Amino acid sequence: MDFLFYIFSSLTLISGSLVIQARNPVHSVLFLVLVFFNAAGLLVLLGLDFFALIFLVVYVGAIAVLFLFVVMMLNIRITEISEKRLRYLPVGGVLGVLFLFEICILIDNDCIPLLSYDIENTALLANYNQLSFIDWRMYLSTSHTIDALGSLLYTYYFYFFLVASLILLVAMIGAIVLTMQKGIRIKRQQVFLQNTRDFAKTIRKVA
């Protein structure tokens, strides 16, 4: 298990670095697809098989393929990419150093201060004992990821699920309305009039 984790994580880091180092944009998109596959493998190792499947379907099946088609359709010159890369290299280096510094601070310190806070002799202890917790381990041990996700969506977050469905419905109806608008000066074929007219009057023989 640990061996597979090290393989997937190392391949993810290597592929992610090759995304920005590849000179060909098509190769960059292919390395990005490899990053998504390795990340899905990490999710499978964590027991989140449904999220790994969604990750592959959404990112690899839709977004990465869209990137690949856009890159292949556009005529991107490699010289322009190399010039822009050298132009933004100092800014990217500074941001990378700052991000690495923040990660080192988070590793050295406790990420969740309340876990290391002593509440035994404070006024928070009474409020802490009155809180009601849900033991999700009991549900996860007897169900799969899809069951747990469905239970959460349709019990605790069904309002948000309905709102998201309504937003998608409004977006779909709006796209249909925008495409169905009839312009006055747009020339269209009148199929009914063409099929019902008398061909003897419309067709002329040229001697």
Swiss-Prot record:
Keywords: Electron transport, Membrane, Mitochondrion, NAD, Respiratory chain, Translocase, Transmembrane, Transmembrane helix, Transport, Ubiquinone. NCBIfam families: PRK06638.1-4. One of its GO terms (molecular function) is NADH dehydrogenase (ubiquinone) activity. It catalyses: a ubiquinone + NADH + 5 H(+)(in) = a ubiquinol + NAD(+) + 4 H(+)(out). This is NADH-ubiquinone oxidoreductase chain 6. Pfam families: Oxidored_q3. The gene is ND6. Signal peptide: none annotated. It is an enzyme of class 7 (translocase). The keyword Transit peptide does not apply. Its main location: mitochondrion.
